[in-house]
C-alpha cells in the first residue's frame, strides 16, 4: 500500500512542484560546547564566495524540540545540477576542511535526503527562525493540494516563509514528509500561529481535506549561515 502512496505522490509532485526538482540532504551532529563560533568561522573560510551550480547550503542550530543533534547542515539544489561549480575546491581542500571540522564536532547524527515539493517563494534565510513538522502522510494525493492551498490562500503573514517536501532516502522514524514555517523570530512565529487560528473556517477546511496524517513531532531551529542561494 505504501508503494501505491509513493506512486501517487510522484504523479502529483510534478504537477505542483517548483519548475525543477529541488532536493536536499540534511546531516545532524553535536557541536562541542562553546565551539559554535569556531565552527561557523570554519564554514565561512571554506564556503564564503564559492559559486554553486544551483542552491547552496545552510548551517543551522537546533533550538526547541527533541532532535538528534545540536546543529545540522542542509545542502540543497536542483536534482542533477547541485554542488559547487567544478574546480572550486580540490580534494586536498576537502580533506583539510573535514579534518578541521572534526575538531569542533562531538558526535555525528543521522542524515536524510528528500525533495522540496513546494515553496511560497520567500527566501528562508531572510526569516532565520523556523519550526519544522514531521509526519507520516498516508494520503499524499489529498495532503499535497490541501497544504498547497493553505500556503497560497490562508497562511500568509508578514512575509513568512513556508515550504514542504518529502523524505526519500532515510527518514526520521516513520516520517514521509515535512513542513517548515519561517518567521523573523520566535515571537513572530507565535503571532503567525494566532493569525492562523483566527480563521477557523480555513483551518477546518484544511484538516478535513488533507487526508489521514500521523503527526510525529516538531522542532525549531535558527539558520546561522547561508552559502549560495535558495
In which residue ranges do the predicted regions lie?
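Sec-dependent N-terminal signal peptides
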Residues: 3-17
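Short S/T/G/P-rich N-terminal loop/turn motif that feeds into the first structured element of a domain
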Residues: 19-203, 208-230
Amino acid at each position: 500500500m505504501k508503494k501505491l502512496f509513493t506512486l501517487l505522490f510522484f504523479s502529483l509532485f510534478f504537477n505542483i512542484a517548483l519548475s525543477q526538482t529541488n532536493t536536499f540532504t540534511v546531516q545532524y551532529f553535536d557541536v562541542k560546547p562553546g565551539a559554535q563560533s569556531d565552527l561557523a568561522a570554519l564554514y565561512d573560510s571554506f564556503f564564503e564566495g564559492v559559486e554553486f551550480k544551483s542552491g547552496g547550503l545552510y548551517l543551522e542550530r537546533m533550538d526547541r524540540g527533541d532532535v538528534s543533534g545540536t546543529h545540522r547542515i542542509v545542502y540543497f539544489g536542483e536534482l542533477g545540477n547541485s554542488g559547487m561549480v567544478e574546480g572550486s575546491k580540490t580534494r586536498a581542500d576537502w580533506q583539510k576542511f573535514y579534518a578541521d571540522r572534526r575538531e569542533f564536532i562531538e558526535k555525528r547524527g543521522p542524515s536524510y535526503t528528500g525533495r522540496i515539493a513546494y515553496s511560497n517563494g520567500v527566501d528562508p534565510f531572510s526569516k532565520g527562525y523556523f519550526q519544522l513538522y514531521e509526519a507520516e502522510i498516508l494520503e499524499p494525493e489529498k495532503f499535497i493540494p490541501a497544504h498547497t492551498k493553505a500556503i497560497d490562500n490562508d497562511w500568509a503573514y508578514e512575509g513568512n516563509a513556508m515550504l514542504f517536501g518529502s523524505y526519500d532516502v532515510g527518514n526520521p522514524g516513520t516520517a514521509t514528509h515535512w513542513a517548515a514555517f519561517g518567521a523573523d523570530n520566535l515571537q513572530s512565529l507565535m503571532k503567525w500561529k494566532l493569525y492562523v487560528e483566527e480563521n477557523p473556517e480555513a483551518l477546518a477546511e484544511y484538516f478535513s481535506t488533507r487526508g489521514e496524517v500521523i503527526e510525529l513531532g516538531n522542532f525549531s531551529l535558527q539558520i546561522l549561515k547561508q552559502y549560495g542561494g535558495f
